[in-house]
């Protein structure tokens, strides 16, 4: 059982966001990012985290992805030509780019400063500025994608492995 004084300290150290769901918290270097249903909040500090930046969005977030330097959000797009909109932010919360796209992905993630999207038959790789570096069909299910060397990546699939050179 907590004492009244301990309970007061506990209440003052936390953050309360009414009507907001925070399904995921990730540590990016020395900061923590709370991925919220309406955006994200960046915190700094280990003992008593300090709120550094909050980014709120109006659209419903359907996917998130991140690495130590980037935080990405994906929304449904109302356009008939492009199904989705991607927004990528720096780890300081500054918008780097926004991009509409039409790849029916099942997985989206960051890998060595690239954004990797894939489904059972397609793979798309974007750089951290949103420029497309690779798009193609694949035979098999993508299991992993990681860097081998300068612009060379290993695509691991259920049917085998392929080396891809990005342009």
Cite the ranges covered by each PLM segment:
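Single conserved hydrophobic/aromatic residue that forms the stacking wall/gate
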Residues: 1-6, 10
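Structural motif
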Residues: 4, 38-44, 80-87, 123-125, ...
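Repeated scaffold domains used in trafficking and secretory/extracellular systems
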Residues: 18-30, 57-68, 101-112, 140-150
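Residue-level marker for isolated small/hydroxyl-bearing positions within beta-strands
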Residues: 35, 74-76, 118, 155-158
């Amino acid at each position: 059982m907590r004492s009244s004084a301990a309970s007061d300290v506990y209440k003052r150290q936390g953050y309360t966001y009414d009507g907001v769901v925070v399904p995921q918290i990730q540590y990016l270097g020395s900061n923590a990012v709370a991925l919220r249903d309406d955006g994200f909040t960046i915190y700094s500090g280990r003992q008593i985290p300090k709120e550094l930046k909050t980014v709120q969005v109006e659209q419903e977030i359907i996917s998130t992805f991140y690495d130590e330097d980037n935080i990405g959000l994906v929304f449904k797009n109302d356009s008939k030509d492009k199904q989705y909109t991607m927004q990528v932010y720096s780890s300081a919360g500054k918008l780097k780019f926004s991009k509409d796209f039409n790849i029916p992905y099942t997985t989206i993630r960051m890998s060595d400063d690239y954004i990797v999207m894939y489904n059972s038959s397609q793979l798309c790789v974007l750089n951290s500025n949103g420029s497309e570096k690779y798009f193609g069909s694949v035979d098999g299910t993508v299991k992993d994608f990681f860097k081998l060397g300068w612009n060379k990546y290993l695509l691991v699939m259920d049917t085998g492995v392929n080396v891809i050179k990005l342009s």
